[in-house]
UniProtKB/Swiss-Prot annotation:
This is Fatty acid elongase 4. Pathway: Lipid metabolism; fatty acid biosynthesis. InterPro entries: ELO_CS (IPR030457), ELO_fam (IPR002076). Disruption phenotype: Genetic disruption in bloodstream form parasites reduces elongation of arachidonoyl-CoA. PANTHER family: ELONGATION OF FATTY ACIDS PROTEIN (PTHR11157:SF133), FATTY ACID ACYL TRANSFERASE-RELATED (PTHR11157). The lineage of its organism: Eukaryota, Discoba, Euglenozoa, Kinetoplastea, Metakinetoplastina. It comes from Trypanosoma brucei brucei (strain 927/4 GUTat10.1). Keywords: Fatty acid biosynthesis, Fatty acid metabolism, Glycoprotein, Lipid biosynthesis, Lipid metabolism, Membrane, Transferase, Transmembrane, Transmembrane helix.
Length: 252
């Protein structure tokens, strides 16, 4: 990795460290308006679709799932080099390629909001859970805040890498089932998601104890956010056990 820096050179600058020209895309206006717009679209589309028939989104979803698989694979692969410094890359250098792909990951969270649009178009109201909306209207906000503070780097890569890897598995499943096939490993996917959040909680604890690059406030944000997702997914998993195995949030 070229032109890597110590974390101190990036922290507190109030900007992306290596790509400051991208700052407008993580400004407070962009973050707040982008996520408020998501909630507005959810409200409006629910009203519009209430008196309409469900739309056939089969072909659109095949294309969408293929694109999501490719994007997730690209992010997971390009964010994997820091793994050679240990799973969590504790006290790792801040490098431009990590920041770039973490920015791509942040942008992908807006693309992921199309999951909700497809759910509403198909009138799958049972999939529009609190967990679904909560996740989509917070995850991009958190990554954007890290980016705008120059902290989307170093050991922070882990959250984006594991999320991209899990999304690769998830969208592969949705593509497979959208083509009419059955996935015998479906029951594992919610467990893999919960493992992801558990590892992110462990990551936050280890960063607090062993890494001096991030303050306690940032570590608590990661810990509490992933703990909230773990609790919500666990509740979803327990409720779905009696109904057969289910997977949260994506339209098929």
């Amino acid at each position: 990795m070229m032109d890597c820096r110590d974390a101190s050179a990036c922290q507190g600058v109030g900007s992306l460290c290596f790509f400051p020209y991208l700052n407008p895309l993580v400004s407070w206006h962009a973050l707040v308006l982008g996520h408020l717009l998501y909630l507005f679209v959810v409200f409006v589309m629910r009203s519009i679709m209430r008196g309409r028939r469900a739309l056939n989104m089969s072909r659109v979803l095949v294309v969408y799932n293929v694109l999501q698989i490719c994007l997730s694979a690209a992010m997971a692969i390009n964010l994997s080099p820091p793994l050679k410094n240990g799973v969590f890359n504790l006290s790792g250098k801040f490098c431009p390629d990590i920041e770039f792909w973490m920015f791509v990951h942040y942008c992908s969270k807006y693309i992921d909001m199309l999951d909700t649009v497809f759910i509403l178009c198909k009138k799958k109201e049972d999939q529009l859970s609190f967990l679904h909306v909560y996740h989509h209207c917070t995850i991009g906000l958190i990554w954007g805040i890290l980016l705008r503070n120059g902290l989307a780097n170093g050991t922070a890569f882990f959250g984006t890498w594991i999320n991209s890897s899990v999304h690769f598995l998830m969208y592969s499943h949705y593509l497979w089932t959208s083509l009419g096939y059955r996935n015998p490993f479906k029951f594992l996917l919610t467990k893999i998601q919960m493992l992801q959040f558990s590892l992110c909680i462990l990551h936050a604890i280890l960063v607090t104890l062993l890494d001096t690059q991030f303050t306690l406030g940032w570590n608590l944000l990661q810990l509490l956010y992933n703990a909230s997702l773990l609790v919500l997914f666990l509740n979803f998993y327990m409720n779905s056990r009696g109904k057969g195995c289910a997977i949260e949030k994506k339209p098929q």
